[in-house]
């Protein structure tokens, strides 16, 4: 059924593409965080194990919300690992073996997503006239800012 929510039809596909690329980024970050949750070792094991668990649970909620936002705009959400890896702007990590490197990698990814989201917020509002997506992305950015702050504080 046709989506008629006040966003020009020509803007729906680019918005969905923006959201699907973000979905891929978030899924890669989710997987990396889950990996670190499973494989962290050392004297801070319990603390970091729980920290990573909270982070991947928050990312899981964000992933679902992003996919649903794309559906609200009348488009399908990408849903395969192959698709995610083809369009993500983040990199996988299977090499980090110490907790400090894990935290630095996660901090880098959260800060990368904050910058991407700042751009996407402006683009969705100004270019595509979609205040709903812009507001949605602002909420995601705030979550990444909070997580980045927690990680920076832990590393300080």
Language model features with spans:
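Residue-level signal for pocket-adjacent positions within structured domains
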Residues: 2, 35, 40-46, 76-79, ...
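A generic "alpha-helical surface" signal
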Residues: 17-20, 24, 50, 57, ...
């Amino acid at each position: 059924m046709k989506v008629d929510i006040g966003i020009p039809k020509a803007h729906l596909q680019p918005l969905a593409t923006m959201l699907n690329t973000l979905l891929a980024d978030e899924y890669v970050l989710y997987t990396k965080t889950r990996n670190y949750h499973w494989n962290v070792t050392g004297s801070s094991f319990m603390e970091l194990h729980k920290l990573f668990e909270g982070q991947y649970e928050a990312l899981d909620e964000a992933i679902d919300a992003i996919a649903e936002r794309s559906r609200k705009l009348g488009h399908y959400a990408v849903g395969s690992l192959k698709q995610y890896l083809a369009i993500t702007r983040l990199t996988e990590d299977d090499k980090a073996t110490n907790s400090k490197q894990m935290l630095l990698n996660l901090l880098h990814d959260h800060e990368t997503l904050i910058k991407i989201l700042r751009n996407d917020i402006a683009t969705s509002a100004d270019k595509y006239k979609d205040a709903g997506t812009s507001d949605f992305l602002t909420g995601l950015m705030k979550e990444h800012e909070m997580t980045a702050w927690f990680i920076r504080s832990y590393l300080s």
